[in-house]
A protein has these predicted regions:
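The feature marks short-to-medium sequence segments in extracytoplasmic or secretory-pathway proteins
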Residues: 75-128, 133
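Terminal, regulation- and interaction-focused segments at domain boundaries
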Residues: 203-233
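Short, solvent-exposed beta-strand/turn "edge" segments of beta-rich domains on protein surfaces
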Residues: 52-69, 75-79, 126-128, 211-212
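Surface-exposed edge beta-strand/loop patches
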Residues: 15-19, 90, 121-187
Length: 409
């Protein structure tokens, strides 16, 4: 029996939850999120790696599987239909999840037992009127903050409910920001469109070093949206949060750099505006850590329509080069306007953009007479900032408004 347990960890690991318990009970943490819309109430939670092992008796995270617990209460009389693709467009089916659990022992026929065990823990798709259904959807692993939709349809009705659920394991940079302490109430002010254009044109041209003595990359983006809409818009577009710089993230970065592999949450260096490092940073990894898009945002004291106004910088890493100051550094694409426009397209295709326009910024620098950033990389630009009005609801690309700041009165 001991030998069997050593060979069959999938079945012999201590499982504190039966399949029925898994369906009915959320993961053992205090990170549940609840949202009510119309006649449905949805509760979600994401199990950490350790909690997943406790619930399922297996290290699912090592197989890139992250269980998301969902409970949907249908408070109406008509049946509703849950669409799991909103949680993850590439989610794993229950049988696929069970198959991955069995890959380590391909010669033993564990199909029937494991399939039933995992399948019985799954969230159903139909929620009858006046009933409640719960269970797990098996998604790809996201760390830091997991962002997803719960999409439910019924007769002539549709519910789209965004969720942001924290997942332990990373030290995310913006978790340390005290948003209420950034500015005294007396400095915060709501402005008109005309005043917004003037105020943005008077903002600093560029990021600086810590002492504020040397200019770096141009501040070429402005984002208007509350904290949740800002996070959700970028994460829905496939951008990841970044870790703080500490031993764990440095080691992960080093391993990724040496192997050329992807590290989605790699720290970004501190750049400064308003005398402080970025409030939040996002990145979109490509084929390796050497190739990524990253952006930094600083909240300003301005509000437009009651929403926070952020100023920021976006650039595209296209390689790594050696420097005297930092030994190695990322090399940016000098066409910073192309990267700026990529962000417009990216948010538009993610249905996160309500409108956009342009204001003056750093001023033009042409191909033959470029400026330089803090690490000596050249860049050229038309000198403008794009102003992005985020949408809290999915916005069709054909309905995005072009804001004429030149005609703002």
């Amino acid at each position: 029996m001991l030998l069997l347990c050593l060979l069959l960890p999938v079945l012999c690991s201590a499982q504190l939850y039966s399949p029925a318990d898994r369906r009915e009970e959320p993961p053992p943490n205090d990170r549940t999120e609840v949202s009510t819309q119309g006649n449905i109430r949805v509760t979600t939670a994401v199990a950490s790696a350790d909690e997943t092992e406790e619930i399922f008796g297996s290290k699912l995270y090592r197989r890139n599987i992250q269980p998301v617990w969902v409970q949907i209460e249908n408070l109406g009389e008509e049946p509703l239909y849950f669409l799991p693709r909103g949680v993850d467009r590439a989610y794993f089916t229950p049988i696929e999840t069970a198959y991955r659990l069995q890959n380590r022992l391909p010669l033993l026929d564990l199909n029937s037992a494991v399939n039933r065990d995992v399948y019985s823990s799954t969230m159903g798709l139909v929620i009858e009127g006046g009933s409640t259904r719960s269970g797990y959807i098996f998604t790809r692993v996201d760390q830091g903050t997991k962002s997803f939709n719960i999409d439910v349809i019924g007769h002539n009705e549709r519910f789209m409910m965004p969720f942001f659920v924290p997942v332990p394991g990373l030290q995310i940079d913006h978790y340390e920001v005290d948003w209420h302490a950034l500015y005294p109430e007396s400095e915060m002010r709501d402005v008109s469109l005309e005043a917004l254009r003037t105020e943005l044109g008077a903002m600093p041209c560029c990021v600086t070093d810590k002492k504020g003595e040397n200019n770096g990359d141009p501040l070429n983006i402005v984002v208007i949206g509350d904290l949740q809409d800002t996070y959700y818009s970028f994460m829905r577009s496939g951008w990841d949060e970044t870790e703080t710089i500490y031993s764990g993230s440095l080691w992960a970065t080093a391993k990724s750099a040496l192997s050329g592999s992807e590290y989605r949450y790699s720290p970004v260096s501190a750049l400064y505006v308003f005398g402080r490092a970025q409030d939040v940073a996002f990145q979109k990894a490509r084929t390796s850590i050497h190739e990524r898009n990253h952006l930094r945002l600083w909240m300003t004291p301005l509000r437009y329509g009651g929403e926070p106004v952020w100023i920021g910088q976006i650039s595209r890493d296209i390689g790594v080069r050696f420097t005297r100051k930092t030994i190695t550094t990322h090399k940016i694409d000098p066409d910073v306007d192309e990267t700026r426009e990529y962000l417009v397209e990216d948010l538009a295709y993610a249905q996160s953009l309500g409108g956009f326009g342009y204001v003056s910024g750093v001023g033009p620098a042409d191909f033959d007479n470029p400026r330089g950033n803090l690490t000596g990389d050249p860049y050229f630009t038309d000198g403008r900032r794009v102003v992005l009005f985020l949408s809290g609801e999915p916005a069709d690309i054909g309905e995005i408004g072009l804001i004429d700041f030149a005609g703002a009165q």
